[in-house]
Amino acid sequence: MAHSLTAAPQTETAEFDLVVLGGGAGGMTAALVGALEGLRTLLIEKSDQVGGTTAYSSGTVWIPNNTQQRQMGVEDGAAASEYLDALVGGRMDRRLRQAFLAAGPLMLDYLTARTDVAFRMYRQQPDYRQDLPGAALGGRPLEPLPFDGRLLGKDFDRVRWPIPELMLFGGMMITRGEATRLLKIGRSWDALLLGATLVSRFLLDRLRYRRGTRLVLGNALAARLFRNLCDRNVAVWFDSTTRRLIAQDGRACGLLVVRNGSEISVRATRGIVLAGGGFPASPELRERFFPKPLATYTSAFAGCTGDTLLLAQEIGAALGPLGEDNSLWFPSSIATRRDGSTAVYPHIVLDRAKPGLVAVNVAGRRFVNEAVSYHEFTRAMYRSHRTVSTIPTWLVCDRRFVWKYGLGIIRPMTPVLGGYVKSGYLKQARSLTGLARIMGVDPAGLAETVRTYNGFARSGVDVQFHRGENAYDRACGDAAHRPNPCLGPIERPPFCAVAVVPTPLGTSLGLLTDESAQVVDRAGQPITALYACGNDMHSVFGGEYPGAGAELGLAMTFGYLAAKHAASAAVPPGSKGDQP
C-alpha cells in the first residue's frame, strides 16, 4: 500500500543585527538606540500593544545629575553616589550603580538630541529615603512631556491603555499636578479653565477615538518611544512568542520565534536584549520567590511572566542573589469592575499620606508611618504580619476625608458611596466599634489607635511613627493643612475603611549583568551578545527603591547601554552586517 508523505513545514528565517524582547520603556529604548546607531533592529512583543507596565505607570524616570539639574547649577553626582551607597550598601556590586549614575544623564541627552522623547524635571519630588545621607529634595525625577496620540495615526491603538481607574470619564488622562489643581475647581478660576480645556479636548477626541488622545504619564513615554521606532522603520513583531534562545561557543546568536502560526529562526548578529518585564504576573514564580502570604494580584502588565528569564537560564544565564522579598511593591485595593474584570488600584500618593487616615492591622493598631513610599509601606505590612495579622491592612478614615481626598478607586467629591459599600469595596459604619466589627479587627484596639492618633493630629507631632516630619512625607500630604500636612483628626461619622494587600509592580530578582548590561553566566563570565534591562535585569539597587521613577530610569539607562555596547561589538563573519 502506497503512503503519501507530507513534507514537514520549513522553518522561516530572518536576520537582524539587534533583537529586543519586550515593548516596555527599557526594550523600546534599546531598540531605538540600536536603530539610531545604524543597526537593523527587531522588537518582539508577545502582546498586541506596546507599553508593558510602563503604560500603567507615572512614566517618571529617576536620573540623578541630569542636564536640567546642571543647568540650574546643581552638580548632583557625588550626593547621588553617597545616597545609593547608604541605601544599597554591599547588597549589589557598586560598579553597577556607578555605571547607572554615569550613563543615565548620557541616555537622556542622547534621546533629547536625536528624538522627541522629552522630559521635564520635578523640582520638588523628594527621594523616598530622606533619612539617608545624600537624599535630594527634588531634581532627580523627570516626567515625560504630554504627547498627542493623533500623531501615531492608525498605530494609536497599539499603545496600551492605562488602568481605567486612573482615567476620568472612561478615557481622559491627567497628570498628578493637574489632579491637584482640579481639586480646587469650585474655588479657583484657574482650575475651572483647566477642567474646561481638558474636557473640551477629550469630547472632541471621543468623536473619532475610543479614548482621549492627550497622553500623559507612562502612556506619553510609551507613545513617544513607539512613534520614534515607527519613524525609523524599526521592525515590530506583535503577538509573537519566543520559544528558544540559541547560543554557540558562549555567544547568543539567535532565537526561535512563533509569529502568525509560523516558526521563524531569527539570527541576531550583534545582540539580543531581554526586556520582558520580570515575573510579577507569574503565579508559579511568585510562589517560588515571593514572601508569604503570597501576593495574588499584580499591578503590572499581565504579560510580565518571566518567560525571558527562563529562556536565558536555559543557555546558562545566572539569576542574582535572593533578597528580602525579590519584589517591588504597591499596596493595592481590589475591586470588581462593572464588566466583571478585576481592578487592582495602587495606593501611591493620593490618599495614604493625607491628613485624616491611619493604616491598621487586625489588632486595630498602626504599624508604620502611613506616608512612607509604597515599597516601604508594603514591606512594613510583611514585617508586621510576622507577629500579628496585617495582610490585608485597613486604611481607616472618616467620610469627610473621602469627600476631600478620595480613597482608592473612590474619587474626591463623590456624593454617594452606597455602590462601593454594596460591592464590598468600602466598609462604612456610624461608629468606630461598628466599623471594626465589619472589618474584623479588634474594636478596642482601633478605638484607642484613633484616639491616640487624633491627639497627634491636634499637636501636629506623630510621637509614634513621626509621620510628616520629613520632606517626602510632606510632599505627599496636603500643604494647605496645618500644623502637619500629613496629620488630621478622624472624628466625624460615618467612618470608612478600605483593605489593601501587597501587589508586585515589578521584580527585583533578575539576571545578573555587567556594567554594559551584558548577562553573565553561573561562572560570572559574560554571555557574549546577550543583554538584559528593566526587571529582567537583577536590581542594581538590591531590591531597594530610591525615588520616583527609579525602575524606569534603570530600565532606559541599561537599555541604552545594551544597544550602545552591541553597536560597538565586532560583527560575526558571514552576517549581512559584515558585508561592505
At which residue positions do the language-model features occur?
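An anion/pyrophosphate-binding glycine-rich loop and adjacent beta-alpha core
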Residues: 130, 138, 145-193, 309, ...
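Helix-rich C-terminal "cap"/substrate-channel and partner-interaction subdomain
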Residues: 387-494, 562-565, 569, 579-580
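Glycine-rich loop(s) and the adjacent beta-strand/alpha-helix scaffold that form part
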Residues: 212-219, 231, 259-338, 517, ...
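N-terminal Rossmann-like FAD-binding beta1-loop-alpha1 element of flavoenzymes
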Residues: 18-43
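Conserved N-terminal/central alpha/beta ligand/cofactor-binding core
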Residues: 46-235, 357-359, 366, 400-403, ...
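Helical element adjacent to the flavin cofactor pocket in flavoenzyme catalytic cores
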Residues: 201-270, 309
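A glycine-rich dinucleotide-binding beta-alpha-beta segment and adjacent secondary-structure elements
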Residues: 244, 251-252, 445-540, 544
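Extreme N-terminal leader/targeting segments of oxidoreductases
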Residues: 1-18, 36, 219, 223, ...
